């Protein structure tokens, strides 16, 4: 059983039982206690559950909403600096892709001065931010709405994505290393990001310093496929040099 299948079963069990213990999950799913703990950590990180002593409970709807809003304000100065730098790459008449990350939402706020711009996004907040701008056309990718992150997930919109071509794709992730590339914890969102990353002339990674050197559950794309990485000025100097030595273009937003 794949991790995402196991984690879906955990969510289903919690939905039925409100709370469940680690030993119970280990017995029901026939895996080790350490595997269950890893699954619970991944689910908590994605905003689906809350770990409690000896087990886990589902988050209430209002807690899930707060979870995404917490992400928006976390490292907000760094995200805003990255967004402003990213906006300098955008030109009128372009088609761009924005993922559903809070950093991409910060970039969306920088786009209101552009004209005849087409924005393809998997982020509901991003679409809402841009929807009333008459100079910007917004296309949602399609997929399943997840209340914890206000994101469209899955590949229900695969046919649409396969028929688009963007000038730029701006994408964030849970982590990045030269060895593993961009990685994220949400299997379904990662699947969608993989498709989007292939439909652009230029892939730009938007990553604040806390994402560097981090490896998460699922791979989005390799470092070789990234055309530019934009980060903030708190990036570890040794990592910055490693990226440069490997030939990865890096822009530091001030």
Swiss-Prot record:
Keyword match Signal: no
Phenotype upon gene inactivation: Cells lacking this gene show a constitutive but glucose-repressible expression of the entire gol operon.
Molecular function via GO: DNA binding; DNA-binding transcription factor activity
Signal peptide: none
Protein's UniProt keywords contain Cytoplasm: no
Residues annotated as domain HTH deoR-type: 3-58
Record keywords, A-Z: DNA-binding, Glycerol metabolism, Repressor, Transcription, Transcription regulation
DNA-binding region(s) in UniProt: 20-39
GO biological process entries: glycerol catabolic process; regulation of DNA-templated transcription
Listed SUPFAM superfamilies: NagB/RpiA/CoA transferase-like, Winged helix' DNA-binding domain
Organism domain of life: Bacteria
Function comment: Involved in the glycerol metabolism. Repressor of the gol operon for glycerol metabolism.
Protein name: HTH-type transcriptional regulator GolR
Species of the source: Listeria innocua serovar 6a (strain ATCC BAA-680 / CLIP 11262)
Encoding gene, per UniProt annotation: golR
